Amino acid sequence: MSNNSTSPAAAEGRTVNIAIVGLGNCATSLVEGLEFYKDAAPDAEIPGLMHTVFGDYHVADVKVVAGFDVDADKVGKDVSEALHSGQNQTIKIADIPHLGVEVKRGPTHDGLGRYYQESIEESSVEPVDVVAELKKAEADVVVSYLPVGSEEADRFYAQCAIDAGCAFVNALPVFIASDPEWAQKFRDAGLPIIGDDIKSQVGATITHRVLAHLFEERGVRLDRTMQLNVGGNMDFKNMLERERLESKKISKTQAVTSNLKTSPVAGKVHDKNVHIGPSDYVGWLNDRKWAYVRLEGSAFGEVPLNLEYKLEVWDSPNSAGIIIDAVRAAKIALDRGVAGPVEAASSYLMKSPPTQLPDDVARTQLEEFISGGIA
């Protein structure tokens, strides 16, 4: 018997039914992770997980019930097969069993940029009625993994989540949870949303954010900073199309500078002394990402103090370690009748939440939320 049998949800036969929009590398790592950690002991400290049991829900209580894509090499396949098709190339952590869930053809809208169109064949199958499919699958939470720049497509799926009575987890930098108009739509519908733009487990954003804040805490003025990122997956190839990058650059930049108070770059997004964003595509890196970060400050006696570091990660597992909590937070919020942005989860797990909080405060609030406190 699996160790998760002691989770409150498992004892009552409750699950977190998720629908995944975009069956790419990130989705692959998430679904493989569900298999990898399904037998994790609830009371153990498990490498790679912040919470083996999140509220009532163990990792094993998360079930994939629907999937949507536009890639001809994925549509019509079982999710388990589709996740190892097309341009997917992330590191493998577990074998995914046959799930009995067919990938449906979703509407494209603006989801395929120029480089995607050059790399994949768009499915000729007629798009399905997404709302009807979500209801049929009895989905609780819709997870949007659409490519960067999919503004219209992401909003379409957010509306579908509302119409189907689902919570929504917005993993990409399209501003929905942080948009007052969209936040109100979810409040009016009585449904929760967590967003925007997933903050990886230990990625360039969280390390840069923490170190920038450390400069200020230790009395060093942060005068200028930069973060350059290169990777070899379809996300980075897609971002070669600079027109699709604007929201991504804003999201990554404000995630760092919003955590500052007194430095010249505090709160800045468009400033010559702050440069943060994706930089280039290097195909042989595959799903790895390399980040080069530099912080320049003024310390005691106005003496220069500079810090440089390089971070190497597998991009998709790094995000899955956060999404695995986000979907359970969304389900808890749904169970409790929380409407609108789930502030605690959004602030700790996302780059561009409705409210930016210091990470220690956000973490404390998230734990309070898990235990039944604030939303």
Indicate residue ranges for each PLM-predicted region.
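Rossmann-fold NAD(P)-binding glycine/threonine-rich loop
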Residues: 147-163, 171-192
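NAD(P)-dependent Rossmann-like dehydrogenase/reductase catalytic/cofactor-binding core
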Residues: 317-375
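Receiver (REC) domain switch-region micro-motif
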Residues: 142, 168, 305
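Rossmann-fold dehydrogenase core element
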Residues: 185-198, 219, 223
